[in-house]
């Protein structure tokens, strides 16, 4: 059985990999995805918001979420995903992380949002479930600022 300290180090590495993955914007790097996520084709990622108003809200496979991010995030000229606080629940293999996104793209459009992530990690150290809380109206405001973004928003 792993010690408490080793479990904390393991969960911390997973959290750091998740942040680095977003900052590198390598959402189509299948090798990297397989190192971070357990089974992205079937494991689920939930996003907050009313599913009738925000097409990205609710439960979707992790890989679908990553695929939907490719055209959106690659349109940013500047992008940062910063973790501000993280807590670990060792018994549940759970990472609770606060983060912030700052981005400029599609012209001079600015996107800023605050997040709370609940990342469930399996015994192999891979993320197998994500719950993401954020202000969905920030995505809506940003997507309506540009015709191309509005089209992408409706495809998510």
UniProtKB/Swiss-Prot annotation:
SUPFAM superfamilies: NTF2-like. InterPro entries: NTF2-like_dom_sf. Belongs to the UPF0523 family. This is UPF0523 protein C.
